[in-house]
Amino acid sequence: GGIAFKVTLSANQTITVPLVLSWDIPIAQAGTGYKWYRRYTRFFGRSGLNSWNIANEALNNYATWESEIDDWQNGIINNSRYPDWLKTTMFNELYYYFIGGTYWEAGAASGQADNPDEDMFSHLECYDYLHYGTSDVRFYGSWPLILLWPEIDKQCVKQFCDSVYHTRNDRPAAIGTCAHDFGSDKTVFTEWNSYTYRDS
C-alpha cells in the first residue's frame, strides 16, 4: 500500500503535510496467558478497530501537544540552575517507561480477578530481572512519575499499600508486610511477589 497527497503550490511556496502512524492493539498479554485491556481503551474502545480514531485525535491535536512539550522541556533546558548533564538525564531517563516493559491496564480481558475501578500501572525492574514494580528498585525511576504523572505514581503507591492487607495467590493473606513486586512478566498483577526471597 501507499499514501499519496496532491497539493497545488505557488512559486517558492512550501507546505507541510502531517503524517500519523497509529495502531489499535487493545489487549496486552502476560506470559501465562492473562490478558489486560490497555489503558487507552478507556477512551477509544476495546474493538481493535479504532486506529483511524486514534490517528484523527493525533492529527487534530499534534500541534498543541508539540507546543506543550516544547514549553515543558524549555523550562528545564533554558534554566541555568540545572547543569547540562542533569538536563540530559532528566529527558533521557524517560525512555524507560516507553520501551515496551510497561503495563497500564484498564480491566481484565481473560476472566482473572480484577477491580474495575483500579487501573494498575507498573513497569519492569529491568530486562535482566523480570519483576514488575519492585518496591526496592522502583524509587530510582519514580521521580518522573511524581513530577509528570502524580496520579499514576499515587496509584503505584496505593498498590503497595493494598498489598499489606491483601494477597494475590502468592502468600498467606493479610500478613502485614508489603509485597516485593507486582508479578513477573508471566504473572503481572495476578501473582505478587514473583521474587520469592522475602517480603519487603
Where are the model-predicted features located?
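Solvent-exposed loop and edge beta-strand segments that line ligand/cofactor-binding
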Residues: 121-137, 186-199
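Charge-dense, low-complexity intrinsically disordered segments
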Residues: 52, 147, 194
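Helix-terminus loop motifs that line ligand-binding clefts
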Residues: 151-200
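Well-ordered alpha-helical segments within folded domains of soluble proteins
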Residues: 132-145, 150-157, 198-200
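Acidic/polar, glycine-enriched structural segments that form the non-catalytic walls/loops
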Residues: 1-135, 151-154, 161-168
